[in-house]
Design a protein with these regions (language model features):
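S-adenosylmethionine
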Residues: 1-180
């Protein structure tokens, strides 16, 4: 099938109500680049738990396990992995030295500037990816509250928190953003 002959919503894998305003705003060439990028699988990024390990050591351990990992372009904690390896079986994962986390989320944590001894609140903690990054930045000191309305998502944080080695994280389920 020649992709160029398909209807726009099929060609770009995007509904017309979204494609039309984007195309008008971006122009044809930029829109095509955006649509193409949205139809490609995202890379697999890892965040090294700097409370427990160094990026170079984790990269070496991954290489010894036959996994090609390169430093991410922007995050000083990140490694970009080729393919989709079974990370949950690796020693670096089991020991909490590495977590799956996209580079954008790593950068958000970095931008907070959280540091030792502070009190920090993550109001939409979910399963805790950014919470764990913040805790490592704080070197497991101070108090880090992980708030979320979903107890189920906070439950997913517990095994990750145990692996991380952090002791300054306090998960709290709240009713809503104005919870007393």
């Amino acid at each position: 099938v020649d992709v160029k002959t398909l209807a726009p919503k099929l060609r770009h894998n995007m509904p017309d109500w979204l494609a039309q305003p984007l195309q008008e705003q971006l122009g044809e060439e930029s829109f095509r680049a955006l649509a193409t990028s949205m139809n490609v699988a995202a890379p697999l990024d890892l965040r090294v738990n700097v409370f427990k390990a160094k990026r170079e050591a984790v990269q070496l351990a991954l290489a010894q396990a036959g996994i090609d990992a390169k430093p991410t372009p922007y995050s000083p904690w990140g490694l970009r992995v080729e393919g989709k390896p079974a990370l949950q079986k690796l020693d670096v994962f089991l020991k909490g030295e590495v977590e799956v986390q996209d580079e954008g989320s790593q950068l958000l944590a970095l931008l907070t500037g959280a540091s030792r001894g502070q009190m920090v609140v993550d109001f939409c903690a979910g399963a805790g990816g950014k919470t764990l990054a913040l805790g490592a930045m704080m070197r497991s000191t101070g108090r880090l509250y992980a708030f979320d309305v979903s107890g189920h998502r906070l439950d997913a944080l517990k095994p990750r928190l145990a692996r991380s080695g952090l002791s300054n994280v306090y998960p709290v389920q709240i009713a809503h953003e104005r919870d007393d």
